[in-house]
Amino acid sequence: MSDAPNSVKIPSELLPADGRFGSGPARVRDAQLKALAAAGREVIGTSHRKAPVKKLVGRIRTGLAELFDLPAGYEVVLGNGGSTVFWDVAAFGLVREKAAHAQFGEFGAKFAKATNTAPFLAESAILDAEPGTGAVPEAVAGADVYAWPHNETSTGVATEIRRPAGIADDALVVIDATSGAGGLPVDIRETDVYYFAPQKNMGSDGGLWIAIMSPRAIERAYEIKDSGRWIPASLDLVTAIENSRKDQTYNTPAVATLLLLAEQIEWINGNGGLAWATERTRSSSELVYRWAENSDVATCFVTDPADRSAVVCTIDFDDSIDAAVVADMLRANGVVDVEPYRKLGRNQLRIATFVSVEPDDVKALLSCIDFVLTAVTK
């Protein structure tokens, strides 16, 4: 059998209704796109300082407060640039002297690098774990920020979010929820900053960061700003806090992103909120993991079920199967973005089961994979 992508034609009855399974940018629902088309003239191309766009930001902030059942004093803060920019925002505006990190994949490591290389901070304490496993930082003398990912998108590992034992009373727990927010369970009271971008479970485009901040974290941001530390204007967390209270961002946002995000949050809340969303992602991901466990050629990359993500499933293949060829053949049939994270370097498929992904589409995807595997092993 040829390895050419077009050499396998998957029967139409096996194909999912929507073939997008990427881990970010991820699936945007048709209903969101229709809402964008319907409302676009009212908001696209209008001032972000005026009521139509400010109402969008207000919908987002109110919707997230409902979704995460925010305690009194917690605030939803927005800024431009995505989670990558927020790492620098946090280095400048949240870490007083020293950060402690757990890293077990590409994205946790990038935030650790941001604080560890900041010339105005002490060397970070970094706990390393092998890709495919998870970790949470332990109490470290002098650390005033403890940071780790809720979900490591590169490896498909999820962690429990709980304030580490023995840390200082005023230490901040800062969680990268970029691919976890809205698809994994969380008690926000265990966090001081729960930050994410909207291009995954939140069903929108990238280029925006959102941070749910505790009163303790807000106080820290003001403390650092008042200390006289030089902070670039575009990375000033206090500026973002104060603009968000006015339902706006410091500089011009991508308004379409805001609209798609508002629609997604309200869709999740309207269906039952975080409890509904997390049950949906759990059931979808379990389909993938059970399939791998019953396969003769595939295994779950994350071996400990307790570490397996409900929103990003990583599946290894043995040497008899070239996963890249499988992904190419799926793509040629309209089933896209199941390639592994590029730097992980494994013979693997990575399948997103974000809340926008219909469980029936996951079942169809697995049938398509079986069809391709049968074809390439004849």
Label each residue range with its predicted role:
Residues 1-47:
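N-terminal "arm"/small-domain region of PLP-dependent enzymes with the aminotransferase-like
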Residues 40-89, 110-114:
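Conserved N-terminal alpha-helix of the aminotransferase class I/II PLP-enzyme fold
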